[in-house]
Curated annotation (Swiss-Prot):
It comes from Xylella fastidiosa (strain Temecula1 / ATCC 700964). Keywords: Ribonucleoprotein, Ribosomal protein. The keyword Oxidoreductase does not apply. Disulfide bonds: none annotated. Gene3D superfamilies: 2.30.30.790. This is Large ribosomal subunit protein bL19. One of its GO terms (cellular component) is cytosolic large ribosomal subunit. Belongs to the bacterial ribosomal protein bL19 family. The keyword Ribosomal protein applies. GO terms for biological process: translation.
Amino acid sequence: MSKLNKSIIAEFESAQITRQVPQFSQGDTIVVNVKVKEGNRERLQAYEGVVIATKNAGLNSAFTVRKISHGYGVERVFQTHSPIIESIEIKRRGKVRAAKLYYLRGLEGKAARIKEDLAATAHEKLARKTVTAKAG
């Protein structure tokens, strides 16, 4: 693909990315509010779990969230800029060293826990306090 075509595609993709997505990484526990259509009405469904993988590819970015539902591991892949995603909320920052956490599939119970990144959590709380103090 020529440089001109790549620049045109990059320009188009940047115009399509309209909303801000919070910065999260592997190991973080997040809540994804998804729009679900049932019949003729639409409602929000919360999907809470651990991010086990991310794919950063501009408009085609995606992330995989794993949760345990009724004793079974359930994974769901979300397109980061999909219109069905209403919001993404970060519940907890995890401290991991691997880029992909597929090894969690083989673990269960307490072995599948991820250590919390207390430094990142404290930094975010401090940032929120300063923003609130400036606004108030």
